[in-house]
Each structure stands twice: as C-alpha cells, then as structure tokens.
Amino acid sequence: MDNFGEILIKWYQDNKRDLPWRRTKNPYLIWISEIILQQTRVAQGYDYYQRFVKRFPDVFSLAAADEDEVMKYWQGLGYYSRARNLHAAARSMAGAGGFPKTYKEVLALKGVGEYTAAAICSFAYGMPYAVVDGNVYR
C-alpha cells in the first residue's frame, strides 16, 4: 500500500491545478469554493468564485448584503438554493462572531453536509477528516 500512496502523491504533484482555494487556510474562502463547485465544473465555477469573493471577501460582508445582491452574483450558476443557504449561514455566523471552528459547528451550517464540513475542517484547520465525495464512493 505504501507504493500506492507514493504513486497517488506523485500523480497529484504532476497533475494538480493551481486554484486559489487550494492556496488558503481561510475557512470562509474554502466554504465558498466548496458550495460553488457543488454540481458545477471547476472551469465554470472559477470565474464565479473570483467575482463572488471580490465582492464578499468575508462572512461579514456576505451577511450584510441583501439577498437580491447575493443572487445577482450567483446568477448563471443555477441551483439557487445554494446561494440562499450561503447567505443564511453567513448571517448566522456573523451573529455568532465568525466562522465556526469545529466539525460539528460547521456541519450545522445551513446547506453544509458531511463532505463540505470535512473539506472545510481538513483544508482550513488541518483536522483529520477524510474528504470523500460521491465519485470516490462509486
């Protein structure tokens, strides 16, 4: 199995894409990327991510926006409940003082399931959660 792990790591080093959400430990930015990329290819989601985080650089700016503006920045991505859930979760987090720090708290955010909570906690906080999506399960 050690050989498999080495092969997998080498493949990743040779094939990884340089994406902004892979260069940060900021849980907010990782959360935004994970939600945008649900049911969306990276090639399409990339520009939306850039525009969205430029306008809403943190949970407080997203929480302060009105829903119509959030929906305007989401327009074209589809699955609009994702944008509504982001906005509702941002308002909840802003009221609580910021982004949650535990898996249980992240999982409790509106629109966040086990995969997204694991991704945020693993990538942002270095917690030992496996980030396993439906493709891996299949």
Question: Residue spans of the language-model regions?
Answer:
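Short, low-complexity, intrinsically disordered N-terminal peptides in bacterial proteins
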Residues: 1-4
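Catalytic cores of DNA base-excision repair glycosylases
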Residues: 6-7, 11-138
